Amino acid sequence: MHLNSSVPQGTPGEPDAQPFSGPQSEMEATFLALSLSNGSGNTSESDTAGPNSDLDVNTDIYSKVLVTAIYLALFVVGTVGNSVTAFTLARKKSLQSLQSTVHYHLGSLALSDLLILLLAMPVELYNFIWVHHPWAFGDAGCRGYYFLRDACTYATALNVASLSVERYLAICHPFKAKTLMSRSRTKKFISAIWLASALLAIPMLFTMGLQNRSGDGTHPGGLVCTPIVDTATVKVVIQVNTFMSFLFPMLVISILNTVIANKLTVMVHQAAEQGRVCTVGTHNGLEHSTFNMTIEPGRVQALRHGVLVLRAVVIAFVVCWLPYHVRRLMFCYISDEQWTTFLFDFYHYFYMLTNALFYVSSAINPILYNLVSANFRQVFLSTLACLCPGWRHRRKKRPTFSRKPNSMSSNHAFSTSATRETLY
């Protein structure tokens, strides 16, 4: 990406450096759309935006091809993985008892990830990577695109957090979990997540809109999907979005998964040191209840595996989403006077990197969450084999092990199947 030589060398945003007519300076006009996570700016090649386009924002062809190849790979992996996950959870009745109600959370997460890939990635590739403007989908398409993208982003983050809450209750408070995590309550909770996500995304319907920023205001090449409110309002929207779709979910995920990992680690150590017997306890007011449970060697290995998966979940969420939100917050906290040509170029390519990581999150979630349950993984691969006959021949045969029921003693009636639901 480079700026045209015709761009004045003074401070970005000065009145004499206006590529388009309108209230924003050149940097404001460019970064308003960039900072809302979708776009390479409101400016493009001078021959398409009108005679007064002094700012040329170009991505070199090699970067475009590389980003396109990465996006296509993520699109294939993500859509196949999330589609098969959703299909598996909806059609396979053998999963109705999978990890208590965790299959509802997995299904909701797969749906939000799938919608992000289907709704956001194609539009971004076309109108923000290859053809900066004119915007090709009209004013309704502009508002609807940002609304749906933000709603699905909120839903993904909140679904990951809700899955952590479900696992925390199931592992650390198994008695309460049986009461709190009923199927009907879980369905209502997930419905509330989607409703909250839609409500949180409503501001995008009024923040974004179609404007013509060509010199005379009529050139068709100057149509851009851009913020139609003042810069201060845009910054508020960005910061609220960052808090609700990243900081808050990350705090919940990090705390709960740390507690879960520590609990599983203690259980593994107890099982290894005390003859495969671990103790699970719960508090109910003044009453303290405990039960001992014998765990087989295979189950101990599964517990160790569960600890690693939980750590991977936290790391993946932070690695994929932190750069994305850091890049957006750059717009909020870097003043116009601090933007240089070098920083502008860095921002543009940093945009492509962070958005690629953002889509990695949607593509990798099926892999991470399929690792949580061996039962789910088995049914997932079985479904994939049915949908893709060629996959059946590539699957390696794995030895099967017979498992004896877990034995336990407790002052509460607690079934073996219920106990298995609290463990990975």
UniProtKB/Swiss-Prot annotation:
Principal subcellular localisation of the protein: membrane
Single GO biological process annotation from the record: associative learning
Bias kind Polar residues: ranges: 403-424
Gene Ontology cellular component list: axon; axon terminus; cell surface; cytoplasmic side of plasma membrane; dendrite; dendritic shaft; dendritic spine; membrane raft
Region (Neurotensin binding): 326-349
Post-translational modification: N-glycosylated. Palmitoylated; this is required for normal localization at membrane rafts and normal GNA11-mediated activation of down-stream signaling cascades. The palmitoylation level increases in response to neurotensin treatment.
Segments on the Extracellular face: 1-68, 124-143, 207-235, 331-348
Compartments, record wording: Cell membrane; Membrane raft
Residues of this chain annotated as glycosylated in UniProt: N4, N38, N42
UniProt keyword Ribosomal protein, yes or no: no
Protein's name according to its UniProt entry: Neurotensin receptor type 1
